[in-house]
């Protein structure tokens, strides 16, 4: 059975005080995340704060990838990921219909720019870096997660070839990589996603962005041709560090 992942990107309201922001994060980590983890069929929960990448990634994001003009949530400051035994665990009951404990709705209404999607794991590879606590745990200390569509059906096939023949085998050997999961959209705007896990933001920058992601700027490379066919969600790819469970 393929693992499911429920992703929620969001911001907190502009002008919120640092005290109010910390109160929301404390509640999220002390109450909401443990509540989600206790739901039947939910296997892990991980919360990330956006940090951004280096200059090469910023150039890729502004010049190489397409951006949707669809009216979808533009939040990108935080990303909450929930793992499930399968994607269907997020539909029985549906995450849209779930009756939450008293006070939860008021807290969660503080989120703005909300964008939600459910994915199923299409394919995955483990990298050379070990997980913190062995198999079955949530994603690593640092992640990069893109969410996107392709412009044409033919570019869908090229995307599949690229991940199967090049990208996933490459990530399986990359220093600092814990795992990579290619995801297929089940619900939400994004039809595709990819979740890269790294031991640290520094390892991601040194071993992935600077020598590899920057190749998307070279129009003679396969990477550039594939990425030119993508239409990304606002802020995608999300790059951030885990804030819950806390790093050890």
What does each model-found stretch correspond to?
Residues 1-248:
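Macromolecular interaction modules
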């Amino acid at each position: 059975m393929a693992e499911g992942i429920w992703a929620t990107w969001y911001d907190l309201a502009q002008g919120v005080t640092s005290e109010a922001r910390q109160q929301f994060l404390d509640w999220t980590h002390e109450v909401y995340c443990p509540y989600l983890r206790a739901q039947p069929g939910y296997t892990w929960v991980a919360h990330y704060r956006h940090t951004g990448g280096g200059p090469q990634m910023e150039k890729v994001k502004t010049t190489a990838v397409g951006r949707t003009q669809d009216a979808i949530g533009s939040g990108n400051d935080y990303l909450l990921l929930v793992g499930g035994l399968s994607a269907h665990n997020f539909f029985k009951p549906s995450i849209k219909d779930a009756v939450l404990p008293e006070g939860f709705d008021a807290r969660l209404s503080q989120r703005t720019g909300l964008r939600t999607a459910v994915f199923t794991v299409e394919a995955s590879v483990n990298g050379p870096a070990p997980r913190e606590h062995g198999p079955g745990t949530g994603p690593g200390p640092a992640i990069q997660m893109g969410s996107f569509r392709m412009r044409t059906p033919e570019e869908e096939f090229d995307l599949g070839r690229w991940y199967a023949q090049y990208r996933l085998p490459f990530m399986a050997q990359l220093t600092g990589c814990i795992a990579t999961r290619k995801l297929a959209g089940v619900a939400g705007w994004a039809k595709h996603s990819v979740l890269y896990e790294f031991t640290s933001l520094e390892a991601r920058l040194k071993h992935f962005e600077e020598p590899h992601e920057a190749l998307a700027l070279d129009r003679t490379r396969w990477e550039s041709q594939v990425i030119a066919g993508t239409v990304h969600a606002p802020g995608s790819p999300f790059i951030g560090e885990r804030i819950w469970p806390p790093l050890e």
